[in-house]
């Protein structure tokens, strides 16, 4: 790609399943300028990556969480006939299921991710270059309000 598009900036997203500083640094060495880390990472894991590579780091701060590790979901393909690993997740973990006793519920559905003031301050202290808000297929008003919320947190406004 660098040969055909030498001036293009390359970002590695969550589908690359970047789980440590070795993988992030490898991507930097082959020409990537930024990686989007999986939503499941702890602050300590993010900090360790930050301390061991100079690649830009981007972190999701709001949106749907998955029961699978980012980039490794096969449920959508099996249950919804759409690949979650190709950006077409059918969100089978958000569906209602019935167990063998006939009880129904959202057994696989984690709560949505929503970072607040303390989490944003931790990311700032770690030295994260960019935050990411899930906005695909969302109402424009939702996106506006969510982005405004995070802008105020970053700028430390009420």
Cite the ranges covered by each PLM segment.
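Active-site pocket-lining/capping segments in soluble small-molecule metabolic enzymes
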Residues: 1-18, 36-130, 137-158
């Amino acid at each position: 790609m660098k040969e055909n598009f030498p001036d293009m900036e390359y970002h590695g997203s969550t589908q690359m399943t970047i789980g440590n500083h070795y993988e992030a640094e490898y991507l930097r060495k082959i020409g990537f300028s930024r990686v989007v880390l999986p939503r499941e990472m702890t602050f300590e894991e993010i900090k360790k990556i930050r301390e061991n590579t100079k690649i830009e780091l981007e972190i999701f701060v709001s949106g749907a969480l998955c029961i699978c590790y980012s980039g490794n979901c096969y449920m959508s393909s099996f249950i919804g006939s759409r690949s979650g690993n190709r950006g077409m997740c059918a969100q089978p973990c958000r569906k209602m299921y019935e167990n063998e006793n006939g009880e129904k519920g959202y057994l696989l559905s984690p709560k949505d991710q929503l970072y607040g003031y303390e989490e944003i301050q931790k990311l700032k202290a770690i030295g994260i270059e960019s935050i990411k808000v899930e906005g695909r297929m969302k109402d424009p008003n939702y996106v506006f309000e969510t982005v405004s919320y995070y802008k105020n947190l970053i700028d430390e406004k009420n």
